[in-house]
Amino acid sequence: LFNVLSNNYFDFEDGVTALDLFAGTGSISIELVSRGCDKVISVEKDPQHLSFISQVMREVKTDKCFPVRADAFKFIEKCSEQFDFIFDDPPYALKDLQSIPSHIFENGLLKENGLLVLEHGKDQNFEDDPHFIERRIYGSVNFSFFRATVPEAE
């Protein structure tokens, strides 16, 4: 995933700000920090996972990651910040999974030309979303990519 992002979308060392929703144990957040993101907010509801993320960030001595204990949907609704990159890895069985992209765009969480990557199972299809740009499949893992600004058809 990060090779695709680096080769096609971002130079993470170029002042990129990121949001990691449903951060779990923080592997994506850690990778974002290691690749040079200026700021990463990790949103996770589980206190043990959040504690682990905080511990790892202390061990690597970074001040670039900000773990937040919150429900991802409530965070999306209340967040007033905008990001260059949002990674979202909700539980595949989450009943509201299909609505996540629209919540993110309705609440203006992405900067202009910002990128949302949503990890999901094979049964979800986002190709009709107006912000959808591509889908990548790696075994049983699917990533749908969305842009805050969709290029106009020529």
Regions found by a protein language model. Give the residues of each.
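Class I S-adenosyl-L-methionine-dependent methyltransferase catalytic core
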Residues: 2-154
